[in-house]
From Swiss-Prot:
Source organism: Arabidopsis thaliana
Induction context: Up-regulated by abscisic acid, cold and drought treatments, but not by high salt.
Membrane topology, record value: Lipid-anchor; GPI-anchor
Glycosylated sites: N30, N40, N135, N154, N167, N207, N312, N317
Domain FAS1 stretches: 29-177, 205-351
Job of this protein: May be a cell surface adhesion protein that is required for normal cell expansion.
Name of the protein in its database record: Fasciclin-like arabinogalactan protein 4
């Protein structure tokens, strides 16, 4: 009788999992490592790192980067990158990240009329009327590819520098592209250099009270924060890693069930609820979308111990960020403020910690809506809508699995079949 080679069910089940793990690991993008091979892109690479965009891209798995070589940085462009506030500079750089892998063949198929491609700036939630997209066109006679924005003249693609299907393509362009909504005349308030060797005082903190006043629909949250005194504590925590604040809108407080009365809570518990809305790290909206560890500690966690008062942050429907408190499921509805080291986001629900509000009471959690109305920053106009990025208009090789992965997958299936 022929010898039968046995193989455990665990091994059979583990092989597909390991292959999936390897494929997802390979899909992660390290844009700094990619650009390090090109010394002429050092200035652009440094901007991506210092602004935090390089880290933001690590969670993406398919994009095209529009990089400006050192030789193409005019004095005006360099001056612009130095003058812009950090949040505006970050949005400027997000506009140079196309959320679509474009191969050389994809570029050749672009029609003369052009194709709209979504940028990472669109995912920030601060764009309006399609201002987060660029129009990519190709001249059929010369073969040159240009990329346009309503706010500035078109830039020309100089070269397809690097392509790693289906993850990243690096295109060099002859100038920076400025998106609509960024004031190129804006500048940071620069302090003169000290005249003595004594240490200068630390910079003034960001005024959270004024941010919430400017947001127009955070009146209830503001009154609770001021009355409890924790808003001062939040402002003191801006230093170091920074903070991310999730502020319920006024309608979120109106939607609280009748058995939840925050005003009746003891002062200490009320402070815990408010601190439960704050992460002790600075996150942009894009970094929340690509967060690798969904369970995040809050300021309340620091007081009550590891594992308690945590939030579960995830992304659904492409670009909608949800926050699960263990009792309610809230959605990020707007970016009220984003300037390193502080970001403030409006949320659709009051985040109730399970430690204080067990689910045994009236159910509060609801499914996230298909579309979430967003209030524009500091505006009383009709809110725009945060939706998933539009479907890819240019056909892309990004939808195809890597050939090597398919061959490896088929080989493993055949190998297991022979062994069994």
């Amino acid at each position: 009788m022929a010898n039968v080679i046995s193989i455990s069910h665990f091994t059979l089940l583990a092989l597909p999992y390991l292959l999936l793990l390897l494929s997802s690991t390979a899909a992660a993008i390290n844009v700094t490592a990619v650009l390090s091979s090109f010394p002429n892109l050092s200035s652009f690479s440094n901007l991506l790192v210092s602004s935090g965009i390089a880290a933001e891209l690590s969670g993406r798995n398919s994009l095209t980067l529009l990089a400006v070589p050192n030789s193409q940085f005019s004095s005006a462009s360099l001056d612009l990158t130095r003058r812009l506030p950090p949040s505006a500079l970050a949005d400027l750089l997000r506009f140079h990240v196309l959320l679509q892998f474009l191969s050389d063949s994809d570029l050749r198929r672009i029609p003369p009329s052009g194709s709209a491609v979504t940028t990472l700036y669109e995912a920030s939630g601060r764009t309006f009327f399609g201002s987060g997209s660029v129009n990519v066109t190709r001249d059929p006679a010369s073969g040159s590819v240009t990329i346009g924005s309503p706010a500035t003249k078109n830039v020309t693609v100089l070269k397809l520098l690097e392509t790693k299907p289906p993850n990243i393509t690096v295109l060099t362009v002859d100038s920076l592209i400025v998106p609509t909504g960024i004031d190129i005349t804006a500048s940071e308030t620069l302090t003169p250099p000290p005249t003595s060797t004594s240490l200068s005082p630390p910079p003034a903190g960001i005024n959270l009270t004024q941010i919430l006043i400017n947001g127009h629909n955070f009146n209830v949250a503001l009154s609770l924060l001021v009355a409890s005194g924790v808003i001062t504590e939040f402002e003191n925590d801006e230093r170091g890693a920074g903070i991310t604040v999730f502020v319920p809108t006024d309608s979120a407080f109106s939607d609280l069930p009748s058995n939840v009365n925050l005003q009746s809570l003891p002062a200490e518990q009320k402070a815990f609820v408010l601190k439960f809305h704050v992460l002790h790290s600075y996150y942009t909206l894009g970094s929340l979308e690509s967060i690798t560890n969904p369970v995040q500690p809050t300021l309340a966690t620091e007081e009550m111990g590891a594992g308690s008062y945590t939030l579960n942050i995830s992304r659904v429907n492409g670009s909608i960020v949800t926050i699960n408190s263990g009792v309610v499921l809230a959605v990020v509805t707007q970016t009220a403020f984003d300037q390193n080291p502080v970001s403030v986001f409006g949320v659709s629900k009051v985040l109730l910690p399970k430690e204080l509000f067990p689910k045994s009471g009236q159910p509060v959690a609801t499914a996230p809506p298909q579309e979430i109305s967003l209030s524009p920053e500091s505006s009383s106009e009709q809110p725009s809508r945060l939706v998933s990025p539009p479907r890819e208009i240019v056909s892309s090789g990004a939808v195809k699995r890597p050939l090597g992965f398919l061959v490896l997958w088929c080989w493993c299936i055949a190998f297991c079949y022979v062994l069994v």
